[in-house]
Structures are given as structure tokens and as C-alpha cells.
Regions:
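Short coil turns that delineate tetratricopeptide repeat
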Residues: 30, 64, 98-101, 135, ...
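Canonical tetratricopeptide repeat
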Residues: 72, 105-109, 142, 149, ...
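Alpha-helical segment of the N-proximal tetratricopeptide repeat
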Residues: 32-58, 62, 239
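Register position in tetratricopeptide repeats
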Residues: 45-46, 79-80, 116, 149, ...
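Residue-level recognition of tetratricopeptide repeat
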Residues: 41, 75, 112, 152, ...
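Start-of-helix register in tetratricopeptide repeats
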Residues: 34, 68, 102-105, 145, ...
Length: 313
């Protein structure tokens, strides 16, 4: 993936980070969403993925060129562990997209499909197209988000060098936003320190990791991005986990966003390291039910399902 300048978004969308912009053009989104989307989201919240897939496929019988329906069907299939079948729908969405923006959304969905399989290289390949699209419209903030999204998939799959590169691209590109305000600058600096700390922890360099944690905290203490506060205990727990300090890791992770499937999975892994298999399985079960189509779910859902299958009940 080359950085051609002309990601988390850190939100957890119902089923697809790629689909959301298609359905979020105005404040009255809820009223404007197609009925099949509302119904499908409800089915997924109830854990009825098979029924949601049937609904989306039924929609595609009458509207085969619907980009939202193709992305939605593919997203459900990824959650069900059927990536190869999912990518047929994403390929269709890319093919029939009638605007560059919609094509980029479909390509982003394709990139996340590969993320569910831990395939950093293919994720990056498709995120590059999305990155280039946002560069063409000079949306530097969104370019940075997409670069961070690719980097997140790569760190989770263990490709630390590629992750470092794309986190740096995200940071540097995001800062190119014209007339960028200080809070936005602080956001990119915080994300960059957060990323460097995690990568250092994964490499076993605890001193460097702690240095970046300290810097990240100083940025947060400025108070310019209070919504990012939830990501500090996540970071501290992450660093402690890879240092083998599992009690500290658990204490910190339990302060993080408990609805984040990645955090749920890490808490499960920490309980497992501490020898509490029952608590580990409890959190793996939570993580396995995620219905987002984004990097946290792409990491958590497959791993949690494998853990549940391998651990004695």
C-alpha cells in the first residue's frame, strides 16, 4: 500500500463502517433508512444473523444493484465466518457503485472482509483505493482515518512494521487538514502516541511503550478531546498485558469501553492468562456476538469463536 496523497474511525457502527455513510446523509437518518436496513439491524441485535441474511438476499432479488444491500449481505457473511462468499457481494457493490464515493465505501467493506481473516496485505490493498478517493476530494481527515483503519488491522494481525507505517501516514495526512484547529491536532498526536505505545509493547520494548503512554496522557490532560479518555485505560491495559502484568491489565481494561468487542476479547485473554477459564469464556461469548463490520469486530469475533471452541466449558 503506497501513500499517495493528492484509521479508528473509533466508532462502533451497527453492522458496517462502510455502509453507514450511505445511510447518514442528513440528521433525519433514522426516518430515511430503507426498511430492510432497519429490519436487518434489529435482527442482528437479536443475534439472528441467518434471518438478516435472508432479508438482505430477498432485497437483492428485487434490487440486485443496491449497494447498501450488497454491503449488508456481505457484512453478515463475514460475521458468520464466510469471507469468500461475503466478498462476492462486496465485489458486486464495487462493480455497480454509481459514484466514486459509493465505490470507495464498497472497497472499504471489502478491506474489512479481509480484516476478518487477519489478512493485512489484502486489507491494505483495498484501503489504498479508499485512501486515494479521499485524497482526490482533499478530505485529509478521512484519509487519516482510513490509514489508521488499515494500520489497526495490521497490528492486530501481527504485521507491526506495516502497522507502524500506516499509523504514521494517518498522523501525517490528518495534520494536512487546512486551517486545522488545535483540538484536531491533539487528536492526531494522541492517536499516534497511542499507536506507538501499542507497537512498542508488542515488540517487547516496555520502556518505549511507557514513554508513549505518558505522552498520550499528557495530551489527554489538555482536555481538548475528552471523548478520547476511554482509550487511555485501553492503552494502559494493552501495554500491561504484553508486559505480562495481567492483574494490572485486567484492572485497566475493566475501565475501558465494555461494549467494545476488542476490549471484551482482551479481558477474556487476560482472565485466561490468570487461570480463570470461566470468566474468560464469559467475555469471549460477549465478543463473539459483535455485529459491527470494523477492525475491533474483525479481530474479536473470529478469535472469540475459536477460544470458545477450544476452551473446556
Amino acid at each position: 500500500m503506497k501513500a499517495t496523497v493528492a484509521l479508528i474511525p473509533q466508532t462502533f457502527l451497527v453492522f458496517s463502517a462502510s455502509l453507514a455513510p450511505l445511510l447518514a446523509q442528513t440528521p433525519s437518518t433514522q426516518q430515511q433508512q430503507p426498511e430492510f436496513v432497519r429490519q436487518g439491524q434489529q435482527l442482528m441485535r437479536e443475534g439472528k444473523l441467518d434471518d438478516a441474511l435472508v432479508l438482505y438476499r430477498k432485497t437483492l432479488q428485487t434490487s440486485p444493484y443496491s449497494v447498501p444491500a450488497n454491503i449488508a449481505a456481505g457484512s453478515v457473511l463475514d460475521l458468520m465466518g464466510q469471507g469468500e462468499e461475503a466478498r462476492k457481494y462486496f465485489a458486486k457493490a464495487i462493480d455497480v457503485a454509481d459514484t466514486p464515493e459509493r465505490k470507495a465505501m464498497a472497497q472499504r467493506a471489502m478491506s474489512m472482509s479481509y480484516a476478518f481473516e487477519g489478512n493485512c496485505k489484502k486489507t491494505v490493498e483495498y484501503e489504498q483505493h479508499v485512501f486515494d478517493y479521499y485524497g482526490s476530494v482533499r478530505n485529509f481527515f478521512q484519509q487519516g482515518e482510513i490509514a489508521d483503519e488499515a494500520a489497526r488491522t495490521c497490528i492486530d494481525s501481527g504485521d507491526l512494521d506495516t502497522a507502524y507505517h500506516w499509523y504514521q501516514v494517518g498522523h501525517d495526512t490528518g495534520l494536512k487538514e487546512p486551517e486545522i484547529k488545535p483540538p484536531r491536532q491533539d487528536l492526531w498526536e494522541f492517536r499516534w502516541e497511542h499507536a506507538q505505545a501499542r507497537i512498542a509493547a508488542r515488540r517487547g520494548n516496555q520502556a518505549d511503550a511507557q514513554k508513549h503512554v505518558t505522552t498520550a496522557k499528557k495530551i489527554l490532560d489538555k482536555g481538548t478531546n475528552p471523548e478520547q479518555a476511554q482509550f487511555l485505560p485501553y492503552l494502559q491495559g494493552y501495554v500491561a498485558f504484553y508486559a505480562g502484568n495481567y492483574k494490572t491489565a485486567l484492572e485497566e481494561l475493566l475501565k475501558a469501553n465494555q461494549n467494545d468487542p476488542f476490549i471484551q476479547c482482551m479481558i477474556g485473554q487476560t482472565h485466561e492468562k490468570l487461570g480463570d477459564k470461566d470468566k474468560a469464556i464469559e467475555f469471549y461469548h460477549k465478543a463473539s456476538t459483535a455485529i459491527a463490520h470494523n477492525p475491533p469486530a474483525a479481530y474479536a469475533v473470529p478469535l472469540a469463536k475459536k477460544k470458545i471452541a477450544s476452551l473446556p466449558s
